[in-house]
UniProtKB/Swiss-Prot annotation:
UniProt-recorded name of the protein: SAGA complex/transcription factor TFIID complex subunit Taf6
Domain of life, source organism: Eukaryota
GO molecular function: protein heterodimerization activity; RNA polymerase II general transcription initiation factor activity; transcription coactivator activity
Family (UniProt): Belongs to the TAF6 family.
InterPro entries, per the entry: ARM-type_fold, Histone-fold, TAF6, TAF6_C, TAF6_C_sf, TAF_TATA-bd_Histone-like_dom
SUPFAM superfamilies: ARM repeat, Histone-fold
Domain notes: The histone-fold domain (HFD) is required for interaction with taf9. The C-terminal HEAT domain is required for bulk transcriptional elongation.
GO CC, any one term: transcription factor TFIID complex
Origin species: Schizosaccharomyces pombe (strain 972 / ATCC 24843) (Fission yeast)
Length: 452
């Protein structure tokens, strides 16, 4: 007598379907017991998938996953999209009822003639800043502050009221929620300690103090070396930008601010990369501004422009690979200022220094072809200008010559010889004034570099 829930007759029916006739009762009973064990095993594994999926209903997907776990080919044609429908088949009188699964009939001709489905898109990944220095940037990928606030209140709802809550919280505890009495405060980007606030005030006041040089140097040294200033970095960048705009007539303060930018860039503990876009306008202002300082006859602004050009080179070399449009934009700004005849020579000087920091190819491609045209403006100033204008024009010519030194030929002068008409070719390339200056210096390496 079989102790399984499976009828021996069912086993014999399946055997006959497979072409096995006259199956004895003993092997049929053994197969029935093994079948019961296998089904229990599959259901047990499928239940694990159901529990891990946090569901209370067993689905055909769980059965398929269990079969794959047991290294058995899963059943095909069964899915969770529609429920299984069993129909009773007509059998003879006195026989047990027979039920079968009502499968949907599929027309092969219709499937063959149907259009192919669309090809799915390729898998792609995109990166964005989740947070920068503890601040979530306002980009489409990140939730807005309003969404965050609404989601926070929706999640609280009627559950969990903080101790010491107001009347609105008591109403929420009783199941009544009202948003009318809720005051939504703006998000605070940074919460600075009193020590950091005091440090910021002392540093900024020391940098703007023109009388105490020692205190100013100590402040710059602190900005260059202290490791715990990352929270203050955005405030220092904002202070730098505002102070440059307000102190264009004070060379001492502007020079100090450029040294401040240098100190922030030199500090190995600060991550300046996210603030390059806010830092560049201040540096470019000190580089190509029409007038720096209150006295037009004070030539110390040239040293400030040299310092700004030096900082410009540091920023472009360090962050040019991250911001791939940084160098082209800076080059375009400097070239536009250099070629604008309405700009003063002080702006031209800063533009030439800025183009020099862009490297050898920028000088060869952008500066050299325009020297001969620029000479027309310089020659007119040398002939009809006053003493101050002549001085500024000569400073620009000196800056151009200094930029051309980047084009020196690396080979030794005795390894190559100059063409017989070197002077004429040089004058044709860079104009008579610059050619005369170069020939006077007798720099053979520079001559070879310009005549390539």
């Amino acid at each position: 007598m079989s102790l399984t829930v499976w009828n021996i007759e069912s086993i014999k029916d399946v055997a006959e379907m497979l072409g096995i006739g006259n199956l004895a009762d003993e092997p049929a009973a053994a197969i029935a017991m093994d079948l019961e064990y296998r089904i229990h095993q599959v259901v047990q594994e499928a239940t694990k998938f159901m529990v891990h999926s946090k569901r209370t209903v067993l689905t055909s997907a769980d059965i398929s996953s269990a079969l794959r776990t047991l290294n058995v080919e899963p059943l095909y044609g069964f899915n969770n999209s529609r429920p299984l429908e069993f129909h009773e088949a007509a059998v003879g009188a006195g026989q047990n009822s027979l039920y079968y699964l009502d499968d949907e009939e599929v027309d092969f001709e219709k499937i063959i003639n149907a259009p192919l489905p669309k090809v799915p898109r390729n898998i792609s990944y995109s990166a964005h800043w989740l947070a920068i220095e503890g601040v979530q940037p306002a980009i489409p990928q990140n939730p807005t502050p309003s969404d965050h606030t609404v989601g926070e209140w929706a999640s609280k709802g009627t559950s969990g009221v903080m101790p010491g809550a107001s009347t609105a919280a008591k109403e929420a505890r009783n199941g009544v929620t009202s948003m009318d009495n809720v005051e939504i405060k703006p998000l605070v980007r940074h919460v600075l300690s009193k020590e950091l606030q005091l440090y910021f005030e002392r540093i900024t006041s020391a940098l703007l103090d023109e009388t105490n040089v020692e205190l100013r140097d100590a402040a710059l040294s602190s900005l260059r070396d202290d490791p715990g200033l990352h929270q203050l970095l955005p405030y220092f960048i904002m202070f730098l930008s505002d102070s440059v705009t307000r102190n264009l007539g004070n060379l001492v303060v502007l020079t100090t601010l450029m040294h401040m930018a240098w100190a922030l860039l030199d500090n190995p503990n600060l991550f300046v990369e996210p603030y390059v876009q806010q830092l560049m306008p201040s540096i470019l202002t000190c580089l190509v501004a029409k007038r720096l300082g209150s006295d037009p006859n004070n030539h110390e602004h040239y040293a400030l422009r040299d310092l700004a050009a030096f900082l410009l080179g540091i920023v472009c070399d360090r962050f040019g690979n991250v911001y791939y449009t940084l160098k082209p934009r800076v080059t375009r700004t400097a070239l536009k200022a250099f070629l604008d005849n309405t700009k003063p020579y002080s702006t031209h000087y800063g533009a030439i220094k800025g183009l020099k920091t862009m490297g050898k190819e920028a000088i060869r491609v952008l500066v050299v072809p325009n020297i001969k045209v620029y000479e027309v403006l310089v020659r007119k100033t040398l002939e009809k200008g006053n003493e101050e204008e002549i001085y500024e024009a000569n400073k620009c010519m000196d800056a151009l010559y200094d930029a051309l030194l980047l084009l020196r030929d690396d080979q030794l002068p005795n390894q190559r010889t100059l063409p017989p008409n070197a002077s004429g070719l040089l004058e044709k390339n860079v104009g008579s004034l610059m050619a005369e200056k170069i020939m006077k210096e007798n720099d053979t390496s520079l001559l070879l570099g310009l005549l390539e």
